[in-house]
């Protein structure tokens, strides 16, 4: 379905029409870094490729020594992989996501967002214990989720946790 297109399906018939004036496409940056499925095509490349490239660019600015690169699942996966590959570092799933909990950053209250993080993520202790970690996330909206994740990693035995954001602007 294209921008401004209406697709109508009735009586086993598919009709498409564009009742609105054609306007220049102005995508939201969050389509590239968060909302789009990794296999969505955006400007001729998959969202996965865009996100992985952001991780590579972030790695070019890195000045921190770490044992492992850990993504905030699932939104930070591709960027963390690009980051790790560019630096030749180990990519590890130091956080395990419960896929039955939805997106936490769009919840209406801080209390619900905090509870959502606790239900959504668990630290993978055997992977992170005594490790210096670079934690990669796609973006930073409020910072409350990142704060809770960092605490979770330290509580699970991480030696150091450094947070890097793939799309900070």
Where do the protein language model's features map onto the residues?
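PRPP-associated nucleotide enzymes
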Residues: 1-169
């Amino acid at each position: 379905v294209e921008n401004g297109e209406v697709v109508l399906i009735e009586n086993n018939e598919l009709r498409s029409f564009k009742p609105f004036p054609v306007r220049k496409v102005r995508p939201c940056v969050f389509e590239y870094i968060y909302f789009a499925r990794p296999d969505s095509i955006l400007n001729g490349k998959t969202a996965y490729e865009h996100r992985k490239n952001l991780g590579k660019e972030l790695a070019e600015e890195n000045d921190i020594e770490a044992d492992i690169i850990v993504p905030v699942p699932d939104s930070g996966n591709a960027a963390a992989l690009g980051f790790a590959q560019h630096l030749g570092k180990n990519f590890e799933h130091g956080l395990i996501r419960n896929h039955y909990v939805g997106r936490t950053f769009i919840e209406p209250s801080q209390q619900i967002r905090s509870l959502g993080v606790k239900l959504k993520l668990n630290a993978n202790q055997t992977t992170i214990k005594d490790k210096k970690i670079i934690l990669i996330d796609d973006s930073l909206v409020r910072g409350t989720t990142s704060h809770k994740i960092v605490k979770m990693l330290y509580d699970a035995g991480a030696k150091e946790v450094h947070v890097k954001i793939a799309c900070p602007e």
